[in-house]
Curated annotation (Swiss-Prot):
Catalyzes the NADPH-dependent reduction of L-glutamate 5-phosphate into L-glutamate 5-semialdehyde and phosphate. The product spontaneously undergoes cyclization to form 1-pyrroline-5-carboxylate. It catalyses: L-glutamate 5-semialdehyde + phosphate + NADP(+) = L-glutamyl 5-phosphate + NADPH + H(+). One of its GO terms (cellular component) is cytoplasm. HAMAP family: ProA. Pfam families: Aldedh. Its EC number is 1.2.1.41. This is Gamma-glutamyl phosphate reductase. Pathway: Amino-acid biosynthesis; L-proline biosynthesis; L-glutamate 5-semialdehyde from L-glutamate: step 2/2.
Length: 416
């Protein structure tokens, strides 16, 4: 069983050792790591094959296997993400504001590291590297606890990172992997208040809920994507068709994929047959439709109440027909996971109202929700997509992994 106390102590010590690292040293190391990832592709693929074989043995679906799979191209993309982080401006030490107060004290507010970040995540091995690169660039140490399905891949990736750190003269404890997949050890990490400054869970609804219930350390909630697309009365239906097909079928296993379709009744009778025909040519979808939508499909099943709350991560989509923009907004706000939502419309006023009133981290007009991604937003590899409002919201890049500190300089000042 993993000794979490010892691991936490090492992480805390490492956070102090890497806190003074300069931008130049950090960027040089990240560039070295990006190259090492590509150079070590075959070793990483061999480790990943063990995870894939185990997953197949346990009957994991093809869609979930895709989340787990590494390929040469995906490793190259991970390396590019690391290099992009190296190329980004360093927020550490950035002066947010500076002034002299009425007492003559010189006050600066600067960005500083959080300290030790813990990350609990599922399936995707790329998260190990993405999370490390962002944590390292912001002078934070990181503890990674991945799912048991990606254990071999995560071990190989973290081993490579630690070797690269050591070869560069930097403490390898800047990154540590919890290899014990037990729930007991995960809960220990959630409660490690002496060592962990913030915990970021990244995974399905069950994981997020467990962390919310059991964590004693501060948590930034991420991930679950019950994402909707609303097709308005004034929508371009050709555009809507293309966007829904992209958002639902391109990669259904990711959190920015659409799960719910909301349609204005004025266009439902035209749009549903049009969409069904077009999507069947790409990838058939199981429609779970409400009473108004059901008779408009050639093939659909009646929706149950829980279907409107579910992140399917599959070729399944709930469908709701509404009578107004106001009803669409109300419905979405009732069922959203506060991740990403979209409206398809040519009505500028409706678009503005939707963006202002829908309670989500990213709200789109006439675009696929699949764009909610730190890399796409220019933040580099993201550590997660926050669905809460405090500290960080939406794709979390470098600034989300910093805090601020006030630096006050005086000359014998005392307060009367």
């Amino acid at each position: 069983m993993t000794d979490m106390r010892r691991l936490g102590q090492r992480a805390k010590q490492a956070s102090l050792l890497i806190a003074p690292l300069s931008t130049q040293i950090k960027n040089r190391f990240l560039s070295t790591l990006a190259k090492a990832l590509v150079d070590d592709t075959q070793t990483l693929l061999a480790a990943n094959q063990k995870d894939l074989a185990n997953a197949k043995e346990h009957g994991i679906s093809d869609i979930m296997m895709d989340r787990l799979r590494l390929t040469s191209e995906r490793i190259k993309a991970i390396a590019q993400g690391v290099q992009q982080v190296a190329d980004l401006a360093d927020p550490i030490g950035q002066v947010i504001k500076g002034y002299t107060n009425l007492d003559g004290l010189k006050i600066l507010q600067k960005r500083v590291p959080l300290g030790v970040i813990a990350m609990i995540f599922e399936s995707r091995p790329n998260v190990s590297v993405d999370a490390f690169s962002l944590a390292f660039k912001t002078n934070n140490a990181i503890i990674l606890r991945g799912g048991k399905d990606a254990l071999y891949s995560n071990k190989a990736l973290v081993k490579l990172i630690r070797q690269s750190l050591e070869e560069s003269g930097i403490t390898p404890d800047a990154v540590q992997l919890v290899e014990d997949p037990s729930h007991a050890v995960a809960e220990e990490l959630m409660q490690a208040t002496d060592y962990v400054d913030v915990l970021i869970p990244r995974g399905g609804a069950k994981l997020i809920q467990t962390v919310k219930e059991k964590a004693k350390v501060p948590v930034i909630e991420t991930g679950v994507g019950n994402v909707h697309i609303y097709v308005d009365a004034q929508a371009d239906l050709d555009m809507a068709t293309k966007i829904v097909i992209n958002a639902k079928t391109k990669r259904p296993s990711v959190c920015n994929a659409a799960e719910g379709l909301v349609i204005h009744e004025a266009v439902a009778a035209r749009f549903i047959p049009m969409l069904e025909k077009a999507i069947n040519q790409v990838q058939p979808v199981e429609w779970r439709a409400d009473d108004k939508a059901l008779p408009l499909f050639e093939q659909a099943v009646p929706a149950k109440a829980e279907d409107f709350e579910t992140e399917f991560l599959d070729y399944i989509m709930s469908v709701k027909v509404v009578s107004s923009l106001e009803e669409a907004i109300s419905w979405i706000n009732q069922h959203t996971s506060h991740h990403s939502e979209a409206i398809i419309t040519r009505d500028t006023k409706a678009a503005e109202t939707f963006q202002d009133l829908v309670d989500a981290a990213a709200v789109y007009v006439n675009a696929s929700t699949r764009f909610t991604d730190g890399f796409v937003f220019g933040l580099g590899a993201e550590i997660g997509i926050s669905t809460q409002k405090i500290h960080a919201r939406g794709p979390m890049g470098l600034e989300a992994l910093t805090s601020t500190k006030f630096y006050i300089n005086g000359d014998g000042h005392i307060r009367e």
